[in-house]
Amino acid sequence: MIKLLKFYILLGCTALCLAGCAKENVVPEEEKAPVQEVEETKPVEDTAEETLETEKEYYPIKKGAIDYLSVKGIELEPGTEIAMVATNSENKFWDMVKSGAQKAVEDLNKELGYSGKDKISLTFTAPKEENVVDQINIIDQFLDKAPDALCIAFTDASASKTQIQMAKYNGIKLIAFDTPDDGQLTEALVGTDNKKAAAEVAEKLFEEIGYKGKVAIIVHNFLTQTGQDRKQAIVDVLANSYNDRDIQFVDIVYLAQEDRSEKEILDELLERNPDLAGIICTDLMTTEMVIDYAKELEEKNFAIAGFDSSEKIVKAVEEDVLIGTMSQDPYGMGYATITTAARAIAGQAKAGSIHSAHQWIDAENLQTEEVQSLLKFLSK
């Protein structure tokens, strides 16, 4: 406790400055959401051996000589504690990440022969909604508990700098997953190559509309690095490769920063642009939102390119509501996050940036063995 107190005193001025810079995200004390209880994740009941084997075959996560879908050779002390904080509990993407993380912890315990109190433990939690203050409150709880490693998918890394610095000061290994911290203070990042994946989505949409017409981008969140990177990659494809074509971005909507309802956003978009040619979505929630809206229309005259995968999204591809979707590999991402954290705790070699897989899915390749192997996690 003395060490923590000293740290808070040392960072007092820094925290005040950061609070000022991030004042948009700060609410008065009486308005803050109550601190959430953090519960330890239960052990995995389904070992999912088949899922992991197909992951390794079709979507390996390797960098250099290290296989991040393997726990072989990792040495951890009995009772090692790992915590993971996602952005929100409403997005099914994080359930898939959690499944992969649980499997990795199960494999570590099996490999090391740990049982009972000696088992490596995983706690996985997130605020109910994507809210900066709520996520910081959860991170603060974990800092009090001082796990061996803390893995975070940042909602707004700039608002979490004090927590990042505190973790490092107290020897907690800090791993970013899905979304990096903007100052690269974490030990490593495990996630999709968002710029590359989003650029591929833009290429698919532009091809579908014949390289002409009005296009809108529905971005999940301006504050997250994933939102910024995916949006910018889409814009850059047009600027760098098709600036001589008649393609025009007519609107870029940041869903998390909107006060309007989802229906109002899309109603107004089509009212202003009745000749809209296409919509590009940047995550699971924005994709499902546009799917739901499109299904209510009497006639849909625009193409939709999605991002992420779920049962609803796959069905929309089958029904030709979507031209396709860019599926990430959340199961593999979760597994690799744990092996990366374990390597950091053990002081073993690891890369600073580890890319999990992404795969464009459309009606033509949906039933292939490769794509189906990636979609197995949807039933988990």
Question: Model-derived features: where do they sit?
Answer:
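Hydrophobic alpha-helical segments within soluble ligand-binding/sensing domains
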Residues: 61-72, 135, 190-215, 229, ...
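Signal peptide-proximal N-terminal region
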Residues: 102-122, 239-246
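Hinge/cleft segment of the Venus flytrap/periplasmic-binding protein
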Residues: 32-34, 40-78, 225-226, 237-241, ...
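Hydrophobic alpha-helical
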Residues: 140-145, 149-168, 234, 254-315
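Bacterial signal peptide processing site
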Residues: 22-24
